[in-house]
Structure formats: C-alpha cells, structure tokens
C-alpha cells in the first residue's frame, strides 16, 4: 500500500517553551486551524486538548508530551497537503526530561517566547537541549497583546542570552491592547486577522505608513541573511540589490536547516493572531524527515552504521515514551526512522536482546486515537502490545539489527520515602511505581536496605508531587510521603598512596590480595553524548607483580566501594585510582581477594585523602516586583545562596543565584507569602559543591546514628 503523504511533505516538530509562554494555547490554535478540533480549548478553563492528564488540567501546566498528527495546506491553500506531527512538550524545569526525549525524535522545533517576559531560564535549558541534538528551529514570540510586550526586545534577548542569530520575518503592528496584526516582510503586506471568526480569515492590506521605514530596514536584513545561503544568491544580490520572494524563502530555508539562523514570527495565540503564519513557516522553513542527516546507529558488534529516512531501508525506530492508557494498557510511542512496520509484525529489541510482536498501531490525536494498519519512515505513532520495552530502546528489523543512539537521562537530585497508608496497598504501590518508572527515566525507585523503606527520586519537588498524585488517581494507592532527602555525594580533595592487604588463613585454602593504589581527585566531566565520567582507573602494573586476571577485580572492588561511600554512605564521584604495585600468592590469591583489597584500599585511603561531602547546588531565578527585592535577596542569602546577578524585565527584577538544594525545600510557599503572591521562581540543577564543615558534621552524624 503506497504512502498517503510523500515523505518530503512530512514535518515532525516539537512546540517547546518556558512554563507560561503560551505553548499549549499555541498548539490548541494549530489544531483548531488545521481543522482537528471544533471548539478551542483554553488552558485556563482546564479544557485544552493536548493536556489530557487530570493533574495537567488542574495545575494548568503540561507534563507529558502528547503527540498529535494534523494536516495543513497553507493560509492561502498555497501548498499541497502537508502532514505535521506535533509534540507538545512541558516547560516546567522538573520535566526537562520530557523535552529532551521529544527533541531527540523531532526534526524541527517551534520555540515559543512570551512577548513581555522574553527569554526565561527554562527557555535557556530548552535551547541548550535543541543545540545538543542539532534541531533546526523557528521562534514564535507570543502574547503580543500582553502589557510590556515588545517583539524586537525579545529578539534582542534571544541574540544576547541564547547566542542565536535571529532573523525576523515579520514585524508587529501595535502591541499590548493595540496589537492588530503583523507585517509579512517577504510579501511586504500587512496581515489583519478577523476577530469575528476566531481568526480563521484575514485581510491583506498595505503596511501602515508609520511602519514602512522599519519594515524596509528589516526586509533588507532578512534579504542579506538569505543571500548568505549560497554563492549564486550572493552574486545576484550584490549585482541587482534585490532577490525575488522565492529566492528569499529558498535562502532562509537552507540556512535554517543548516542551523545558522533562527527565523522569528510574532502574534497572540490567545487572540487568534499569527498562528497560521507560524504553520506556513513550519512547512516552508523546517525540514522533512529526509532533509535531516541520516540517523547514526551501530550494529550489534558495535560497528558504526546509519539509517536514512526511506521506506526501502530496513525497519528501525526509537521508543521515546511509554504511557499507561486506561483502555488499552501500555502504549509505546515510537518514531520510525526507516522502513515500514505493519500491525502484527515481529520486531527485535537489540538493547534487551528480545523479540516482540506489535499488536496494534494507533495514531494519537492528543488523547483520542485512531487505529492504523502500518507506519512508515518519518511517522510517529504508538504501539500496543509491547511488553519489555523501556524509554530509549531501539526496535528494528529481525534480520538487520541496529542500535540507535541511546537517550541520556539526568541523575535525580531529590528523594523522598513513601509508604502506602494501608498494608494491603503495598503490592499495588510497587506495581504503580514500577509502571511510572518505566514511563519516566528521570524518576527512580529503590528500597533502602537498612530501613526497608521505598525511596523515590526525581528532578524536583513538583516532579515527585505529581508522581504521588498519579499513584492516587491512576492506581488508587494512597501514600504517606516523608521529608525530602537531598542526593549528597562524596569525593576526595587530596592525593594519597594506599597500601592495603587482604589476608585470611583459616585451614584449607586461604585468601590473599595485596595492592598499592594512588588515589587523587578527578575533574567530573561530561562527554558529547552527555555521559558523566566520575571514576577513572589506571593500570600501571609492570613485571607482572599482580597477574592480569586480578587487575579488573581491583577496579571493580574500588567502584563498588564508591557506590557505598566512605563517610556517610553517599555515592562517591571524582576519583582517579592508579594501581601501581602489590603482590600475590600462587595458591591463595583469587579475584575475590583482590576485589576486597581494592575496596579496602579506597575505604582506608579516602579518609587520608581528605574525603568530604558534596551537595547539589541549584541555579535559581526569582522574578519579583521591585518592592520585594530586598526581602527576596535577604532570604536567598539566609539560604546560603550566592547572588550571581540582577536583570530588568517588564514584570520586575530578575535575581539569579546559586543556592544549595537542601535550603530550597518549601521555597515556593515562602516566596509567595513574602511577595503577596507576585514573585515567581524557577530552579534547575547546576553542579555539585562542597558542604561547609559544620553542616557536613551534622549530615554524617545523622546518617551514622
């Protein structure tokens, strides 16, 4: 059965932004204009189509990325029908992981900014993630009807704070309550949307006289940006001083796809202005699946390979999200990179080494679903019936297996103990937590060996609140939650040479392992794939004083001891161990003996190497009206915060600070009462840093008591 839509007419895009930039409203309008939803869902009525979990509707934020398929032929029906797969991503920093996994499977993104508050901390995080995956993007400056909205100021912030080369393709006509429409700098006409039909129709009129000069300046800048795409465009531009509209679009598209420029659009989704122009921009400037580089992967033997976006290549897809659906059970969202998959086909999961059969395939329209018979390269769909798949796994052809690059997930920074309110719920709670952990890799569950408590860990207080809330709603488990615990770490500050010997003689065969190891601090670094290097082992044994087969176990022993720490039982990071001497016994030495000797060496050596405790430091940004600035800063100082800088923004002052996570619990309530509800804040993990001695002593005492 042939394709319904040619691959070059596909667009897989994400809509990402800061918490309140109006992302979900923008997506709602897109669904309305593309004819998918007949009544516009407003977020503040708790009715938006894309926000389908109960908590999202209550809290007015988007938590899980809903995937939706829709079609668009242009504002003037100027294109053939294009198929747009949209993923609406959350903007709250505790759910960065959802954004990360969406960007991993998208080909392009629309980043939404608020016209008045501009570039906010979360926007920086999203931007960094999009850079990491090389995602071409366009910008929509929304909420142009809000007080303090200023399109050109926001473009300036994107240049300075995000270091992006922004090229406006529109200019706003009026702002705040006088926002009327936009100037299209390519056609050099003003677009005025009609209020009467929720902006479905519009008029093309002449540019208002007072904006003519500025529009011409911006058009020149845009034309120069387009001319830089190729030598022929540049030559023509230098000779004639002008490019045709088609040439401008062609040049801009080439540079967006090369990630050299970012085009800026503006409007107000809530007031139904500007969204269709962004949809045209998606079609005109963002890539089809076969216009992005072929996806890199490796064979099962670790040889590099690639899969290009074509139905004729062997099947390969990435499972980028799991969700539990009340009617059909487990849904596995997949992005198909190559080949074709029909319902009922068997696929191979090389990460788990297992064969699975796909029961049914459904296409999601927010939380409504339509069953389909097959998916092809470029499609995003959900499979029903896969049993043993986790987020980030590859699904591929049985005969030509490849492993797509794994997704990388951050380590949680906060933990709480949970226990079911009734003993009868213990098993239900375990099942619920297991399902939630499979869905969300930044959420971990473990049992504390000493206390037997169930400990859940995540990216922030809101993240864990929502997990506990979902246990109650979706799995009917009521749980008591303990006080939040910080994910402390341990490390060493000095260098030491440690001589450790493990000898045991008790009749029969003894045990003998002797090592001399140099321990020194290691700078914790992150590689291109985002993996952290926290331990390095160097083998400098010469002349066989320790036989080869015992060297691996020494490293293993040290690593195992690192997970248990040496001061207060917290995992260690930043250790370099060099094994340079030792001895062995012909009969009594064994792998086990050397493993124990390795772990003893670290335990004894770390204390001499000035071991210390590290705590997570958060980057906190508080937006506060001028009147409460003194209180906010005084409070951050009391929380051991270091103020990094101050900025202006239309809603007041922005204070940036580095504050230990341990001091930030319950901050949301404090900052609200301090400012009578007018200040807001966001925080994300920045780094680990040493805990002051007096606090470290308390931590060690309470852990060891």
From Swiss-Prot:
| GO MF term list | GTP binding; GTPase activity; guanosine tetraphosphate binding; translation elongation factor activity
Cystine pairs annotated here are none
Q: SUPFAM superfamilies this protein is in?
A: EF-G C-terminal domain-like, P-loop containing nucleoside triphosphate hydrolases, Ribosomal protein S5 domain 2-like, Translation proteins
One of its GO biological process terms is: ribosome disassembly
Q: Which residue intervals define the domain tr-type G in the entry? A: 8-290
Q: Which residues form a coiled coil?
A: none
Subcellular location per UniProt equals: Cytoplasm
Family, according to the entry, reads as follows: Belongs to the TRAFAC class translation factor GTPase superfamily. Classic translation factor GTPase family. EF-G/EF-2 subfamily.
Would you tell me the protein name for this molecule? Elongation factor G
Organism from which the protein derives = Francisella philomiragia subsp. philomiragia (strain ATCC 25017 / CCUG 19701 / FSC 153 / O#319-036)
State the organism's lineage. Bacteria, Pseudomonadati, Pseudomonadota, Gammaproteobacteria, Thiotrichales
């Amino acid at each position: 059965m042939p394709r319904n839509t040619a691959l070059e007419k596909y667009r897989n895009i994400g809509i990402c932004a800061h918490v309140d930039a109006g992302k979900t409203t923008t997506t709602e309008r897109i669904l309305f204009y593309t004819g998918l939803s007949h009544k516009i869902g407003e977020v503040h009525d708790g009715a938006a189509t894309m926000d389908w979990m109960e908590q999202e509707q209550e809290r007015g934020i988007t938590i899980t990325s809903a995937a939706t398929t829709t079609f668009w032929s242009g504002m003037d029906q100027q294109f053939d029908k294009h198929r747009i797969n949209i993923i609406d991503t959350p903007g709250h920093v505790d759910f960065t992981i959802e954004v990360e996994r969406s960007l991993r499977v998208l080909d392009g993104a629309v980043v939404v900014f608020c016209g008045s508050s501009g570039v906010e901390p979360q926007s920086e995080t999203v931007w960094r993630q999009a850079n990491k995956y090389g995602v071409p993007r366009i910008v929509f400056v929304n909420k142009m009807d809000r007080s303090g909205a200023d399109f050109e100021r926001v473009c300036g912030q994107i240049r300075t704070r995000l270091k992006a080369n922004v090229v406006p393709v529109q200019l706003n006509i009026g702002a705040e309550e006088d926002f009327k429409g936009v100037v299209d700098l390519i056609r050099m006409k003003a677009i005025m949307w009609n209020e009467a039909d929720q902006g479905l129709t519009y008029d093309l009129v002449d540019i208002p006289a007072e904006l003519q000069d500025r529009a011409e300046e911006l058009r020149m800048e845009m034309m120069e940006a387009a001319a830089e795409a190729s030598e022929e465009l540049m030559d023509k531009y230098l000779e004639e001083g002008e490019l045709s509209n088609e040439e401008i679009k062609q040049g801009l598209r080439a540079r967006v796809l090369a990630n050299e420029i970012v085009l800026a659009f503006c409007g107000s989704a809530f007031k139904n202005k500007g969204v269709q122009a962004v949809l045209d921009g998606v079609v005109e400037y963002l890539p089809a699946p076969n216009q992005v580089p072929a996806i890199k992967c490796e064979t099962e033997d670790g040889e590099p390979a690639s899969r290009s976006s074509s139905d004729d290549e062997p099947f390969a897809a990435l499972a980028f999200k799991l969700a539990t659906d009340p009617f059909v059970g487990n849904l596995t969202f997949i992005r198909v990179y190559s080949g074709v998959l029909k319902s009922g086909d068997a696929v191979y999961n090389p990460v788990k080494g297992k064969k699975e059969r796909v029961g049914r395939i459904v296409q999601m329209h927010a939380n409504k679903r339509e069953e389909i018979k097959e998916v092809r390269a470029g499609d995003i769909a959900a499979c029903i019936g896969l049993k043993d798949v986790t987020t980030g796994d590859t699904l591929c052809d049985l005969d030509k297996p490849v492993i797509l690059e794994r997704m990388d997930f951050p380590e949680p920074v906060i933990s709480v103990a949970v226990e079911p309110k009734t003993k009868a719920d213990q098993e239900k709670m375990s099942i619920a937590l297991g399902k939630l952990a499979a869905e969300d890799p930044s959420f971990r569950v473990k049992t504390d060996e000493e206390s037997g408590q169930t400990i859940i860990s995540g990216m922030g207080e809101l993240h864990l609140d929502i997990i506990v809330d979902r246990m109650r709603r979706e799995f009917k488990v009521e749980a008591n939650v303990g006080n939040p615990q910080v994910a402390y770490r341990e490390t060493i500050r000095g260098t030491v040479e440690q001589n450790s010997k493990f000898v045991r003689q008790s009749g029969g065969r003894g045990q003998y392992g002797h090592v001399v190891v140099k321990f020194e601090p290691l700078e914790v670094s992150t590689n291109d794939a985002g993996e952290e290097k926290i331990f390095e082992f160097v083998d400098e044994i010469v002349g066989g004083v320790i036989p080869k087969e015992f060297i691996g176990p020494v490293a293993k022993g040290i690593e195992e001891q690192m997970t248990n720490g040496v001061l207060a039982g917290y995992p260690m990071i930043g250790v370099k161990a060099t094994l340079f001497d030792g001895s062995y016994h012909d009969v009594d030495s064994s792998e086990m003996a050397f493993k124990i000797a390795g772990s003893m060496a670290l335990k004894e050596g770390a204390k001499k190497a000035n071991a210390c405790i590290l705590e997570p430091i958060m980057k906190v940004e508080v937006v506060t009206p001028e009147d409460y600035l003194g209180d906010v800063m005084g409070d951050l100082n009391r929380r051991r915060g270091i103020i990094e800088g101050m900025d202006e923004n239309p809603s007041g002052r922005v204070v940036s600070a580095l504050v230990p996570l341990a001091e930030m619990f319950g901050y949301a309530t404090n900052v609200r009462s301090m400012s009578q509800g007018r200040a807001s804040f966001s925080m994300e993990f920045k780094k680990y840093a040493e805990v002051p001695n007096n606090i470290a002593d308390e931590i060690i005492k309470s852990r060891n008591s």
